[in-house]
Amino acid sequence: MGVTVVSHPLVQHKLTIMRKKETSTASFRRLLKEISLLLCYEVTRNLELTTMSIETPLMPMEAPVLEGKKLVFASILRAGNGLLEGMLDLVPAARVAHIGLYRDHDTLQPIEYYFKAPEDIVNRLVIVVDPMLATANSAIAAIDKLKERGATNIRFLCLLAAPEGIERFTKAHPDVEVFTASIDERLDEKGYIVPGLGDAGDRMYGTK
């Protein structure tokens, strides 16, 4: 399906402020909400429409509305939750799934500790959200789990991606399109994206 880099000037401007090491936790959290709304606009750009009969104050008309069941936003915990607020502001009727994964700092492999999703996920477009696509191990594991539950229409949304992560992800899930604000230079020896913005979860919640 490929990779879409969202190059909108507002996205790029806000991302630059988020990258700065002196940006406060409060500002980082606010910017993450703002940029997630803009990214959500892009990832939902080609949703299918149908029409419904309505009446305006002047006359009846056939007006466009979204077709099919509501979206599912699937957050990879914990950092993925930072993207949810802005996205739910834009699509308040969306369902939400949570996938609890943490990365073993020695092996860099994901370890699952929680999974909760709508039962009828098979009939819905699922947008998986995580700020970083670094090694891609967590993203691959999350989508493996969603596919096990029957999801077939999946997209992945992140702030930053590493070339190594994109390569691994697209090999594992070639049917899932990736949307990101930036493809950075590389991963460092600890598996972090560089130049990156640090640990998104820590910067969002003020932890280390």
UniProtKB/Swiss-Prot annotation:
Cofactor note: Binds 1 Mg(2+) ion per subunit. The magnesium is bound as Mg-PRPP.
Biological processes annotated in GO: UMP salvage; uracil salvage
Binding site for 5-phospho-alpha-D-ribose 1-diphosphate: 78, 103, 130-138, 199
EC number: 2.4.2.9
InterPro entries named among the record's database cross-references: PRibTrfase_dom, PRTase-like, Upp_B, UPRTase/APRTase, Ura_phspho_trans
Cysteines engaged in disulfide bonds, as pairs: none
Associated pathway: Pyrimidine metabolism; UMP biosynthesis via salvage pathway; UMP from uracil: step 1/1
Residues reported in the UniProt entry to bind uracil: 193, 198-200
Summary of activators and inhibitors of this protein: Allosterically activated by GTP.
SUPFAM superfamilies: PRTase-like
Molecular function GO labels: GTP binding; magnesium ion binding; uracil phosphoribosyltransferase activity
PANTHER family noted in UniProt: ADENINE PHOSPHORIBOSYLTRANSFERASE, URACIL PHOSPHORIBOSYLTRANSFERASE, CHLOROPLASTIC
Family: Belongs to the UPRTase family.
Protein's job: Catalyzes the conversion of uracil and 5-phospho-alpha-D-ribose 1-diphosphate (PRPP) to UMP and diphosphate.
Entry protein name: Uracil phosphoribosyltransferase
Organism lineage string: Bacteria, Pseudomonadati, Pseudomonadota, Alphaproteobacteria, Hyphomicrobiales
Gene, per the UniProt record: upp
